[in-house]
């Protein structure tokens, strides 16, 4: 039974429910076909749906439990109807090009022995290949679409249902990019779903509801524009250290942060009026863990939040938010981006997020009011900017809400510009006074207006090189994949200075601020740079210890490349031993923070002692992470300041391009008399 229809989707090729298990195998080719069985018996009449963003097609299995579709290549969401007696998500988005020849496995496995009963229902997961139990695609909140768009997440009602937790829920709306593993044909195209608020759990197989194991809650990064929880696995941390690991999706882009109080009824909660919907999704995940994690063997009184990049900024938001008091007890902040570039758009005053750009308190060029003005003109409701501003002021709350909530995600996203690929140029976290204090980041942490818990924080030595790869003023891409450096000298200098600026504000200054209020601040620098030389591409020079490369090491997963297309350029058999050692080292420190409240000497007390941060700049106050083949893991002296960096950049004469030099200076320090005298 074969049906043919056209999709801009990817190819999948076998999905089955077998031996008390749901399992799916995706093979090459353009067919979707498979067999459905339960406890080894073929099941007829089971609905299987394949869809993209334009249409969907459903078929049912035949008497042999088999089904088949014939499809072109592209992007699919494959969903299997739950077997009788179960509810819940059993689908997964699949990215695959029709011209790929490799085989990709996507498994949906249900093991009845994994049953965990909570107030939300009884969840059934499956076993990972290392014996860890996992529960994926657990609904953390009702779908934030329709009237729930731009509202605080609504908790899921209690139930006694048997719920499939066998596949991660769909990613939140974002644009396709190399950083979210989309194929090149989907770069810049919308992927994901508004119905995306799902979480995933990993636990040791023998963990019971009385074990009170430490919990590690991961928040992914992606510039508040892209990313998803299913990129990361907690199975290695759970296996090695006996902890519970949780990760989750949160709304991003304008669906995650959209500060326009006029859109909401006055009776709406302060949380809904905050504009911080992605941040509220993160708070909601903590609330979910607090209520339910004991059923999985976790201790709600021993929760560690850790995140990278935008996830690190989110971790800072969790530390600062009045809503998270008592919901977590340790934190790790990996490569937060805290405004070293003058036009940064993270953690903004309300005026910046909301106002028009020409008001007395000017808003950002893509503030919510500016976006609304653009939308009214685009949709033919206003002839020009002045008319759009006048119309905006006369719209009732109901008219405004109906107009914006009725807009498709595609229409909404088309109003925004992007930078460095799929990152949206827009304000995100808002200082609303309810979800986030009405203070800037430095003031919040300098004055102690946050939850003081033991903290690991740090940055990577070559943070910004990952982003230089996407800058057209430094690199040229061949075939949309291979970056060629235009000028090696300028590239290395830019990578050095941008990365130093990142480290100063997000490591040195943040550590100094927090250590004024607490003693248990532990600071690191990630130095691993043993990528291979690929003849025309010396990846150690191109990337070095770049942004995001430390993530796999903190998760004891040395083969994790957050950008899958770079896997070949990062990992080799030659650097495997060093990577494995470093992953064991870093993850042991992270896990020991979760378990004891201090990284100390790691879980087995066999690593260098990690001492707390001090304002004594001559002290060894920084843990440097590297392999034994290089300089090893050791405490080092670390000291850098914006004033010192500025003096070095002003004295720099090594740039061949004046425009690159001028752009770097103004992006880090802003326009001043020094640079004005040099640059036109």
Language model: regions and residue ranges:
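Structured interaction patches on ligand/partner-binding surfaces of diverse proteins
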Residues: 83-106
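Short, acidic Ser/Thr/Gly-rich low-complexity loop/linker segments typical of extracellular
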Residues: 52-66, 70
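Substrate-access "cap/lid" subdomains that shape
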Residues: 184-185, 291, 317-320, 325, ...
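Mobile gating loops/cap/lid regions near enzyme active sites that modulate substrate access
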Residues: 512-680
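Non-catalytic accessory segments of hydrolases
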Residues: 111-276, 300, 565-583, 597-601, ...
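Short, ordered, surface-exposed loop/turn motifs in non-cytosolic proteins
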Residues: 38-54, 73
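A short, solvent-exposed beta-strand micro-motif common in secreted/extracellular proteins
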Residues: 74-85
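A short, amphipathic beta-strand motif
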Residues: 32-38, 65, 108
């Amino acid at each position: 039974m074969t049906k043919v229809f056209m999709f801009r989707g990817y190819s999948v090729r076998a999905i089955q429910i077998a031996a008390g298990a749901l399992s799916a195998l995706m093979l090459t080719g353009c067919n979707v076909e498979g067999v459905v069985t339960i406890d080894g018996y073929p099941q007829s009449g089971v609905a299987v749906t394949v869809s993209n963003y334009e249409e969907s097609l459903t078929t049912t299995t035949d008497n042999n439990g088999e089904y088949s579709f014939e499809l072109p290549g592209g992007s699919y969401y494959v969903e299997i109807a739950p077997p009788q007696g179960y509810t819940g998500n059993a689908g997964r988005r699949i990215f695959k090009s029709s011209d790929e020849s490799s085989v990709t496995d996507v498994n949906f496995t249900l093991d009845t022995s994994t049953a965990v009963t909570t107030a939300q229902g009884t969840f059934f997961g499956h076993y990972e290949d290392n014996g860890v139990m996992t529960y994926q695609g657990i609904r953390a909140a009702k779908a934030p679409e329709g009237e729930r768009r731009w509202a605080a997440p609504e908790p899921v009602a209690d139930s006694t249902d048997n719920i499939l937790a066998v596949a991660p829920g769909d990613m939140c709306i974002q644009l396709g990019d190399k950083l979210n593993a989309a194929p090149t044909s989907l770069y810049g195209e919308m992927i994901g779903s508004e119905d995306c608020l799902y979480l995933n759990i990993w636990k040791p197989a023998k963990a019971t509801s009385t074990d009170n194991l430490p919990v590690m809650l991961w928040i992914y990064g992606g510039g508040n524009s892209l990313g998803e929880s299913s990129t990361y696995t907690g199975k290695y941390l759970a296996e090695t250290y006996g902890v519970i690991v949780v990760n989750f999706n949160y709304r991003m882009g304008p669906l995650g942060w959209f500060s326009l109080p006029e859109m909401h009824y006055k009776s709406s909660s302060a949380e809904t009026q905050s504009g911080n919907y992605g941040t509220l999704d993160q708070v909601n995940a903590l609330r979910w863990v607090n209520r339910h994690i004991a059923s999985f063997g976790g201790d709600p009184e021993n929760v560690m939040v850790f995140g990278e990049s935008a996830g690190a900024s989110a971790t800072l938001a969790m530390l600062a938010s009045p809503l998270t008091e008592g919901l977590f007890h340790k934190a790790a902040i990996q490569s937060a981006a805290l405004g070293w570039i003058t036009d940064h758009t993270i953690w903004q005053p309300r005026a910046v997020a909301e106002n028009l750009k020409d008001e007395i308190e000017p808003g950002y060029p893509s503030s919510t009011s500016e976006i609304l003005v653009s939308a009214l003109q685009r949709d033919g409701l206003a002839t020009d900017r002045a008319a759009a501003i006048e119309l905006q002021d006369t719209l009732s709350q109901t008219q405004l809400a109906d107009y914006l909530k009725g807009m498709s995600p595609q229409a909404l996203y088309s109003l925004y510009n992007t930078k460095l690929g799929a990152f949206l140029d827009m304000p995100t976290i808002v200082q609303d006074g309810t979800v986030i204090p009405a203070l800037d980041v430095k003031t919040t942490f300098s004055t102690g207006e946050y939850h003081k818990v033991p903290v690991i924080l740090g940055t990577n030595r070559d943070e910004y090189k990952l982003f230089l790869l996407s800058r057209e003023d430094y690199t040229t891409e061949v075939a949309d994949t291979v970056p060629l450096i235009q000028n090696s000298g300028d590239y290395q200098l830019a990578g050095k200075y941008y990365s130093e600026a990142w480290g100063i504000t997000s490591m040195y200054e943040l550590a100094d601020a927090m250590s004024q209020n607490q003693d248990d601040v532990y600071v690191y620098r990630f130095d691993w740079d043993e990528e291979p030389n690929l003849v025309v591409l010396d990846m150690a020079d191109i990337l070095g210890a770049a942004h995001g490369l430390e993530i796999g090491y903190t998760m004891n997963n040395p083969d994790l490349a957050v950008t899958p297309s770079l896997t070949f350029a990062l990992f080799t058999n030659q650097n495997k031993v060093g990577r494995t050692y470093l992953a064991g080292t870093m993850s042991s420190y992270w896990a020991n923070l979760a378990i004891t409240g201090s990284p100390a000497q790691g879980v087995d007390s066999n690593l260098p002692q990690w001492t707390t941060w001090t304002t004594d700049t001559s002290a060894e106050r920084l843990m440097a992470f590297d392999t034994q083949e290089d300089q090893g893991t050791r405490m080092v002296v670390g000291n850098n300041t914006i004033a010192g960096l500025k003096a070095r950049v002003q004295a720099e004469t090594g740039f061949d391009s004046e425009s690159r030099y001028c752009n770097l200076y103004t992006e880090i320090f802003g326009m001043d008399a020094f640079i004005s005298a040099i640059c036109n």
